[in-house]
């Protein structure tokens, strides 16, 4: 119904030490980059709240439109695309995150779906098979 126009993350990759100073003195924010799609796919798409197409629209298409980022999948354009494995089942283990942030509210939880690969300007910048970026 247009209530939610887009979904984004506040990827704030603080160290364990920075997050262990107590509520008042700890760095604010959470690591969201490595779990955002999986959490939303698991809890919204797989439960029938929204479609996968709607999730892609909320996380990718609409932010591009709102922020006037040129692009799209067209012949002759360099690819800016994220490939998803929507069936991949995995357990969150924040100690294995590539990010500096090693604390996650989803630690130990089962997820379905993951980013398989990210291509930016035609170059692979992340590959989940090799965990290289």
What are the functions of these language-model segments?
Residues 1:
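Acidic, glycine-rich loop-and-beta core segments that form the ion-binding/anion-interacting portion
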Residues 25, 78-133:
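C-terminal cap of metal-dependent C-N hydrolases
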Residues 5-7, 12-87:
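His/Asp/Glu-enriched, well-ordered alpha-helical/loop segment
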């Amino acid at each position: 119904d247009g209530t939610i126009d887009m979904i984004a993350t506040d990827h704030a990759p603080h160290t364990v030490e920075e997050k262990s100073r107590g509520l008042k003195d700890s760095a604010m924010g959470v690591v969201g980059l490595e779990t955002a799609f999986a959490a939303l796919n698991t809890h919204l798409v797989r439960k029938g709240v929204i479609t996968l197409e709607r999730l892609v629209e909320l996380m990718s298409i609409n932010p591009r439109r709102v922020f006037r980022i040129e692009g799209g999948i067209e012949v002759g354009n360099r690819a800016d695309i994220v490939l998803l494995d929507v069936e991949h089942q995995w357990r969150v283990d924040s100690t294995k995150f590539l990010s500096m942030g090693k604390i996650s509210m989803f630690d130990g939880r089962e997820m379905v779906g993951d980013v398989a690969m990210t291509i930016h300007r035609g170059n692979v910048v992340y590959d989940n098979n090799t965990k290289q970026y």
